[in-house]
């Protein structure tokens, strides 16, 4: 979310099982200095129970964290990132707002990795090999890890932090976690910035299942793409794929890797999915300056892509070339790639840089069932693959996880809404929910308008893509995001003061 993989894409693709390396630990607390870009931190591990909710065993694992106390002063706040579906490095690099706040707030900066992602593997190399292991991968288990982590930092790791305020930060699925962290553990977390968090995107949340592609299409059309150009492109690909000469033309035009050459007319499906995935991902990271979160991209990449599709192509070849220019901008803007590997069963997806390709699919095959599909014209400019059904999705889950003894009863479409709330969060407090109008995941956000309800704030960034406000300050930032970050900063300061006032009261 956060950074999420489209469920429609998952239905059409499979991924290879990746076994991750064990973290190298020394006495259970391996640590060393690291830096990513301009951000510096200590990497370490703390011991966490594999099952914090049961009292049947004492099994533990090494949970990874990043810590920076360069600007921390005794009693200062702890800015706590709730790690989401990927290795921790990517989120530390792309959550500059926390790093920017640390000097002003005299704060410690903490990132804690989500269990089963990155180096936080409860069963080391066996974590993904059996449902008896992978079954411990869930949002509620991760939240318990975070709660334990706060106690570790306050009591053992950060000097004088026993009464420090804790402010949770997260984007996408991490934003959902930061909000739920505050809701589930209000005695531990004093406030949360939940950016681009689709907290109401569950089976029973009553959001349109095709809203993601509706927003993707809106973003591209608003940026200058011609709807007919895109739709003619799909038709052109289908027609060209029917002949040997047409497939050869597409193999050359798209510079397809030998692993993903078009060999028959049905192969066009994976090429179309490859293009669609790039467009859906590009809409998420449509920032006003060059970035490399999911892929190296120029400023306002959707606008740049639409320069190639401002008018319908006059021939099938021209229409196919328009889509090629869009997909090549996403996957190869730097020009470093000589070929495109488009078959997702054999190649990385648009989200490959996040790592752990099977972790999030497993969560969507158990607790995080999020209906998502395209319905075609007039909703979007993709092809129709709606309706989303649990039965159809269960087939994907069985295909992907049957080798580790998964069965269809583990797909629980109502689990997420039951655990956290499918349509409302009545116990929420001290949370800022920020969503971007340009971000497809805003369709399942807390609200679609600016609103204040008690101490819960909803804010919409009209020029905002996926958790834009969490990124660090940049010379090309919009004035809008500067104002939103200023508002969020004031909210955080208010929560810190409330914590100090309440701590004094009970001294």
Curated annotation (Swiss-Prot):
Keyword Secreted belongs to the record: no
Presence of the UniProt keyword Signal in the record: yes
GO molecular function list: dipeptidyl-peptidase activity; serine-type exopeptidase activity
Signal peptide (from-to): 1-16
Entry-listed glycosylation sites: 125, 332, 407
EC number: 3.4.-.-
A GO BP annotation: proteolysis
Keyword terms: Glycoprotein, Hydrolase, Protease, Serine protease, Signal
Lineage top rank: taxon: Eukaryota
Active site: 172, 439, 466
One Pfam entry name: Peptidase_S28
PANTHER family, A to Z: LYSOSOMAL PRO-X CARBOXYPEPTIDASE (PTHR11010:SF38), PROTEASE S28 PRO-X CARBOXYPEPTIDASE-RELATED (PTHR11010)
Recorded family membership: Belongs to the peptidase S28 family.
Name the record gives this protein: Prolyl carboxy peptidase like protein 5
């Amino acid at each position: 979310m956060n950074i999420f993989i489209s469920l429609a894409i998952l239905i059409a693709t499979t991924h290879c099982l990746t076994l991750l390396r064990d973290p190298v630990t020394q006495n259970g607390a391996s640590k060393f200095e690291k830096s990513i870009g301009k951000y510096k931190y200590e990497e370490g591990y703390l011991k966490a129970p594999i099952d914090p909710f049961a009292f049947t065993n004492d099994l533990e694992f090494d949970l990874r964290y990043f810590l920076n106390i360069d600007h921390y002063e005794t009693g200062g706040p702890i800015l706590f990132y709730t790690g989401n579906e990927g290795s921790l490095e990517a989120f530390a690099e792309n959550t500059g707002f926390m790093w920017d706040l640390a000097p002003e707030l005299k704060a410690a900066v903490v990132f804690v990795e989500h269990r089963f992602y990155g180096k936080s593997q409860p069963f080391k190399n066996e974590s993904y090999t059996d449902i008896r292991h992978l079954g411990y991968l869930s949002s509620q288990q991760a939240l318990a890890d975070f709660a334990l982590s706060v106690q570790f930092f306050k009591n053992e790791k950060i000097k004088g932090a026993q009464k420090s305020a804790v402010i949770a930060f997260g984007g996408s699925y991490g934003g959902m976690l930061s909000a739920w962290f505050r809701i589930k553990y209000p005695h531990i977390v004093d406030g949360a910035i939940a950016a681009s968090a689709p907290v109401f995107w569950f089976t029973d949340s009553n959001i349109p299942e095709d809203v993601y592609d509706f927003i993707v299409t809106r973003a591209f059309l608003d940026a200058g793409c011609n709807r007919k150009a895109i739709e003619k492109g799909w038709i052109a690909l289908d027609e060209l794929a029917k002949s040997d000469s047409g497939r050869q033309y597409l193999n050359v035009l798209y510079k397809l890797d030998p692993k993903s050459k078009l060999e028959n007319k049905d192969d066009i499906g994976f090429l179309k999915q490859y293009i669609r995935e790039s467009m859906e991902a590009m809409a998420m990271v449509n920032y006003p300056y060059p970035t490399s979160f999911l892929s190296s991209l120029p400023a306002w990449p959707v606008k740049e892509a639409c320069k190639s599709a401002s008018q319908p192509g006059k021939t099938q070849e021209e229409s196919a070339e328009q889509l090629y220019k869009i997909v090549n901008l996403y996957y190869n803007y730097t020009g470093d790639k000589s070929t495109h590997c488009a078959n997702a069963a054999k190649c990385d997806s648009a989200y490959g840089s996040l790592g752990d390709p099977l972790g999030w699919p497993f969560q969507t095959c158990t607790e995080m069932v999020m209906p998502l599909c395209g319905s075609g014209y007039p909703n979007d400019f993709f092809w129709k693959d709606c309706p989303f059904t649990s039965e159809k999705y269960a087939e994907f889950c069985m295909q992907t996880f049957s080798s580790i003894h998964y069965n269809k009863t583990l797909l629980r479409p109502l689990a997420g809404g039951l655990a956290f709330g499918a349509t409302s969060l009545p116990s929420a407090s001290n949370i800022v929910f920020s969503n971007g109008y340009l971000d497809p995941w805003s369709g399942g956000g807390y609200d679609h308008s600016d609103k204040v309800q008690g101490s819960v704030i909803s804010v919409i960034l009209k020029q905002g893509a996926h958790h834009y406000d969490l990124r660090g300050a940049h010379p090309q930032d919009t004035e809008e995001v500067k104002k939103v970050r200023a508002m969020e900063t004031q909210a955080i300061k208010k929560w810190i003061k409330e914590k100090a006032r309440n701590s004094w009261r009970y001294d």
